[in-house]
A protein has these predicted regions:
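Hot-dog-fold acyl-thioester-processing enzymes
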Residues: 1-59, 114-121
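Short secondary-structure boundary segments
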Residues: 54, 59, 67, 76-79
Length: 121
């Protein structure tokens, strides 16, 4: 697994809440899109994700927003794995303005389950 992966984004108007800033759900969408692209870059494409025996469950997500994102802001989301033990892995991420400082830092706990029994693989 590549240790670090970065993807670029530009904030679209549909990602904003009534206050004109990115809604919390869209920060999670950015994370999922980046994680998906990270997997695809490693060969874990849609065919791999359709494996009926294994699936990913996100147990916990913690996001610290340091600066609000607004329409047309451009930023990169960098993701990396910090720990993998048994069926649990922890990955971190940070968002940085294209030419500036950190926007968000996050840690996500994941677990791989066997779908037939629902037990940890």
């Amino acid at each position: 697994m590549s240790k670090i992966f970065t993807r670029s984004f530009r904030v679209r108007w549909g990602e904003l809440d009534p206050s004109g800033t990115v809604s919390p759900a869209n920060y999670l969408r950015y994370l999922i899109e980046t994680a998906w692209d990270w997997g695809t870059a490693m060969g874990w494409d849609a065919n791999y994700s359709q494996n009926p025996d294994v699936f990913w469950v996100i147990r916990e997500t913690e996001i610290h927003i340091l600066h609000s994102l607004r329409h047309n802001d451009e930023f990169g989301l960098t993701i990396w794995m910090v720990n993998w033990k048994g069926v649990r892995g922890t990955r971190c991420f940070e968002l940085k303005f294209k030419d500036s400082d950190e926007v968000i830092a996050q840690g996500t706990q994941q677990v791989v389950l066997e779908s037939a029994s629902g037990k940890q693989a």
